[in-house]
Swiss-Prot record:
Protein name: ABSCISIC ACID-INSENSITIVE 5-like protein 4
Gene Ontology MF, one: DNA-binding transcription factor activity
Biased composition (Polar residues): 274-291
Region (Leucine-zipper): 339-360
Post-translational modification: Phosphorylated by CPK4, CPK11, SRK2D and SRK2I in vitro.
Gene that this polypeptide is encoded by: ABF1
Taxonomic source organism: Arabidopsis thaliana
Induction note: Up-regulated by abscisic acid (ABA) and cold.
Entry annotated with the keyword Translocase: no
Keywords: Abscisic acid signaling pathway, Activator, DNA-binding, Nucleus, Phosphoprotein, Transcription, Transcription regulation
A Gene Ontology BP annotation from the UniProt entry: abscisic acid-activated signaling pathway
């Protein structure tokens, strides 16, 4: 059991992809005609021509996934042929493929008629006239999707040149994970010697078996292939960055991620140290891990919005209480002043009344004294008068 680096696909070599293209096309669903698809994948009573484009693509993806799963299952038991990469030129997945709204709602027959009418309106002759005579059942799925504009030729070429698949170039049964673009990372498990193959893009260092191995793309390959379009740089030049545990955590140690041990063990874990190298660094400098400088992320300032709101509410409540108390004191003071003024007025009225009463009592007493000094008047005695009323 050993670990080695496979750099066959780092330079973007398209010769191997072109060699595996016929085999890949023979095993792909997109090389089948609609009649063959109907006889192979079609359901009874349901024609592919009556399906919408969305439904057609969903059925193709389902069949492709099923084929890939069956191929993977069979590849574990028996090694595949040399250079066989099933699903290498597969269609883009639903997450990256968007159909036009007008095209997704049309059926396959309507799209086929529209393509024929469009070619007829352009006035093409010669070989195009022979192609227009071709029926939908004789048309391959790949040609139909290309003419409909669902699959671009650039995408198909990139998929054909991709090295991702379920069989490595050495013909051993295994499992390989790739990105679908040349010059990118791919990890494969070889079935013969149980080794791990890591196809890594230049510019990213890997720690394999406790050592750092750097893959650099030679400049001669770029000069030999000037006509090939270079893919965009996925891993730019980066500096060493170290992530350390926060200060408040109980475990304050740094965790490093390594890929030590056999290839069939669990690959890595949660790590706290991330190190990236640039294409300009030499392999001698990357033989061992450089001691990282820990960069501690602080907790940052906590949000005090809740506390500020509580303090603001208390201040507003205190201001309201003070204003209410001032208003109540003003009302009490005004009421007290009114009462005092009323008392003063009542006192004045009482004094006037007391003076009048004293004068009246004085005059009454003087009159009584004068009356008592006068002699009493004697009344005349009244006698009974004799009357002659009797008979005598």
């Amino acid at each position: 059991m050993g670990t080695h680096i496979d750099i066959n696909n780092l330079g973007g070599d398209t010769s191997r992809g072109n060699e595996s293209k016929p085999l890949a096309r023979q095993s792909s669903l997109y090389s089948l005609t609609f009649d063959e698809l109907q006889s192979t994948l079609g359901e009874p009573g349901k024609d592919f021509g009556s399906m919408n484009m969305d439904e057609l693509l969903k059925n193709i993806w389902t069949a492709e996934d099923t084929q890939a799963f069956m191929t993977t299952t069979s590849s574990v038991a028996a090694p595949g042929p040399s250079g066989f990469v099933p699903g290498g030129n597969g269609l883009q997945r639903q997450g990256s493929l968007t159909l036009p709204r007008t095209l997704s709602q049309k059926t396959v027959d309507e799209v086929w008629k529209y393509l024929n009418s469009k070619e007829g309106s352009n006035g093409n002759t010669g070989t195009d006239a022979l192609e227009r005579q071709q029926t939908l059942g004789e048309m391959t799925l790949e040609d139909f999707l290309l003419r409909a504009g669902v699959v671009k030729e650039d995408n198909t070429q990139q998929n054909e040149n991709s090295s991702s698949g379920f069989y490595a170039n050495n013909g051993a049964a295994g499992l390989e994970f790739g990105f679908g673009q040349p010059n990118q990372n791919s990890i494969s498990f070889n079935g013969n010697n149980s080794s791990m193959i890591m196809n890594q893009a230049p510019g990213l260092g890997l720690k394999v078996g406790g050592t750092m191995q750097q893959q650099q793309q030679p400049h001669q390959q770029q000069l030999q292939q000037p006509h090939q379009r270079l893919p965009p740089t996925i891993f730019p030049k980066q500096a060493n960055v170290t992530f350390a545990a926060p200060v408040n955590m109980v475990n304050r140690g740094l965790f490093e991620t390594s890929a030590d041990g056999p290839a069939n063990s669990n690959m890595g874990g949660a790590g706290g140290t991330v190190t990236a190298t640039s294409p300009g660094t030499s392999s001698a400098e990357n033989n061992t891990w450089s001691s990282p400088v820990p960069y501690v992320f602080g907790r940052g300032r906590r949000s005090n919005t809740g506390l500020e709101k509580v303090v603001e509410r208390r201040q507003k409540r205190m201001i309201k209480n003070r204003e209410s108390a001032a208003r109540s004191r003003a009302r009490k003071q005004a009421y007290t002043l009114e009462l005092e003024a009323e008392i003063e007025s009542l006192k004045l009225v009482n004094q006037d009344l007391q003076k009048k009463q004293a004068e009246i009592m004085k005059t009454h007493n003087s009159e009584l004294k004068e009356f008592s000094k006068q002699p009493p008047l004697l009344a005349k005695r009244q006698c009974l008068r004799r009357t002659l009323t009797g008979p005598w």
